[in-house]
């Protein structure tokens, strides 16, 4: 469920 602002673009985290 990557619909949280933190996970939607968390690729290089």
From Swiss-Prot:
It is found in: Virion. One of its GO terms (biological process) is virion attachment to host cell. GO terms for cellular component: viral capsid. Keywords: Capsid protein, Clathrin-mediated endocytosis of virus by host, Host-virus interaction, Viral attachment to host cell, Viral penetration into host cytoplasm, Viral penetration via permeabilization of host membrane, Virion, Virus endocytosis by host, Virus entry into host cell. It comes from the Viruses. Signal peptide: none annotated. Capsid protein self-assembles to form an icosahedral capsid with a T=1 symmetry, about 22 nm in diameter, and consisting of 60 copies of size variants of the capsid proteins, which differ in the N-terminushe capsid encapsulates the genomic ssDNA. Capsid proteins are responsible for the attachment to host cell receptors. This attachment induces virion internalization predominantly through clathrin-dependent endocytosis. This is Capsid protein VP1/VP2. It comes from Infectious hypodermal and hematopoietic necrosis virus (strain Hawaii).
């Amino acid at each position: 469920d990557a619909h949280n602002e933190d996970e939607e673009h968390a690729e290089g985290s």
